[in-house]
């Protein structure tokens, strides 16, 4: 039997960060602090996982939602037994002698609720669904806990008829994501008897739009020998910018109209690995304090990217070694004995476009004739890094390494 975990992360169309004032009107400090208890562990896990994925795919695109993966693994721990449960939670950075397990799940419950409901200016759909064969039955303890803390929805499927089961799952995901993802599973034979799907659909709005009339086709330099054509968006305005003195890169910070903030990081040519190695929670906090308003001519590709990963071996390298080994380690999920779990898969899709809440004044590529400070030009026409954070919950929503835009 196969346990397949799918995180479907769709549509990024795009608000400071941890030092910013949250836009949520909730002023109850005890409530506000609960979800931020998770932030240090979640962000540390995010960068550890991101670096493992990058190392496993040199020269390729990487894109994931760390907070989504953390949430799914924490939920799985409800069905794990003994040492496996400790491995899962410790792999996420939790010290169970300092933080009671019940508190961890309560914090994730609050975080999940905030991410789903706090941003009225964006479309966001988040959820968890467990498809299990009709011969299996969930244990009441796992069913109750996973639904209460993580909103898990359990559905029966006939996995003896994989073509029919895959169509059922595809239709469910299509409906939940408003048609933004289709054909998640192909109609091919599978030994799966239980499939966990963690999905998130997000369509945000930039605070400052990119003028559509300024978008033009340009070269994107994949490497020294490969070039592809991409539509390149453009805007010229004051925005937060940094030419980092510690890591060899430039970066800009762009905001959504809600609680989200995007960092676009452009490494010096040949220094992508150096910059990625230097990414950490401390780096993000330093950047948040160091970015200063500057006049910038900004060029960003209008593209869609996607990634699919079998996380099993990577999570094993990170110390969660029992996640895929023996069925007894997850004896708390179903009343029936589970065969060996063999796959944990994460899938992500990202799209950038020009849409924003505030229309930008028409901008012209090239210099104006009247006297003005010369803008800094930041041209994302070669491999770059993108990160999206929710600055109210301090969550790492998305991390990406963009190399090839074909």
UniProtKB/Swiss-Prot annotation:
Residues 1-22 form the signal peptide. It is found in: Secreted. GO terms for cellular component: extracellular space. Cortisol binds at residues 253, 285, 394. The record marks 249 as: Conserved cysteine within steroid binding domain. Keywords: Glycoprotein, Lipid-binding, Secreted, Signal, Steroid-binding, Transport. It holds the Pfam family Serpin. Glycans are attached at residues 95, 119, 223, 259. InterPro entries: Serpin_CS, Serpin_dom, Serpin_fam, Serpin_sf, Serpin_sf_1, Serpin_sf_2. SUPFAM superfamilies: Serpins. GO terms for molecular function: serine-type endopeptidase inhibitor activity; steroid binding. The keyword Signal applies. Proteolytic cleavage leads to an important conformation change. This reduces the affinity for steroids. Major transport protein for glucocorticoids and progestins in the blood of almost all vertebrate species. Belongs to the serpin family. This is Corticosteroid-binding globulin. The lineage of its organism: Eukaryota, Metazoa, Chordata, Craniata, Vertebrata.
């Amino acid at each position: 039997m196969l346990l397949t975990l799918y995180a479907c992360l769709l549509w990024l169309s795009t608000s400071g960060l941890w030092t910013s004032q949250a836009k949520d009107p909730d002023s109850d400090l005890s409530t506000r602090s609960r979800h931020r208890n998770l932030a240090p562990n979640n962000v540390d896990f995010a960068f550890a996982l991101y670096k493992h994925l990058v190392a496993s795919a040199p020269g390729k695109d990487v894109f994931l939602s760390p907070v989504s993966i953390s949430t799914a693994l924490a939920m799985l721990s409800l069905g794990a037994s003994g040492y496996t449960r400790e491995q899962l939670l410790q792999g996420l950075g939790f010290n169970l002698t300092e933080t009671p397990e019940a508190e961890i799940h309560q914090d994730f419950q609050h975080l999940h609720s905030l991410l789903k409901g706090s941003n009225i200016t964006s479309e966001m759909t988040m959820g968890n669904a467990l498809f299990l064969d009709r011969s299996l039955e969930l244990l009441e303890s796992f069913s109750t806990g996973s639904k209460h803390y993580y909103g898990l929805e359990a559905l029966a499927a006939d996995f003896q008829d994989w073509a029919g089961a895959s169509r059922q799952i595809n239709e469910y995901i299509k409906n939940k994501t408003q048609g933004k993802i289709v054909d998640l599973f192909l109609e091919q034979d599978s030994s799966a008897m239980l499939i966990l799907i963690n999905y998130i659909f997000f369509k945000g709005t930039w605070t400052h739009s990119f003028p559509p009339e300024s978008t033009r086709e340009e070269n994107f330099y994949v490497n020294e020998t490969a070039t592809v054509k991409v539509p390149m968006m453009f805007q010229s305005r004051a925005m937060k910018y940094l030419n980092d003195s510690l890591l060899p890169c430039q970066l800009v910070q762009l905001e959504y109209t809600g609680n989200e903030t995007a960092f676009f990081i452009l490494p010096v040519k040949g220094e992508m690995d150096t910059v990625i190695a230097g990414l950490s929670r401390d780096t993000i906090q330093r950047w948040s304090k160091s970015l200063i308003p500057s006049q910038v001519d900004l060029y960003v590709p209008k593209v869609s990217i996607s990634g699919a990963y079998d996380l099993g071996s990577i999570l094993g390298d990170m110390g969660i070694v029992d996640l895929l080994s023996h069925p007894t380690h997850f004896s708390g999920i179903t009343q029936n004995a589970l065969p060996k779990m063999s796959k944990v898969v994460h899938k992500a899709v990202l799209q950038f476009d020009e849409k924003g809440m505030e229309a930008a004044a028409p901008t012209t590529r090239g210099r104006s004739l009247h006297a003005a400070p010369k803008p800094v030009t930041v041209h994302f026409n070669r491999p770059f890094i993108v990160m999206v954070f929710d600055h109210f919950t301090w969550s790492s929503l998305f991390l990406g390494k963009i190399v090839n835009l074909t």
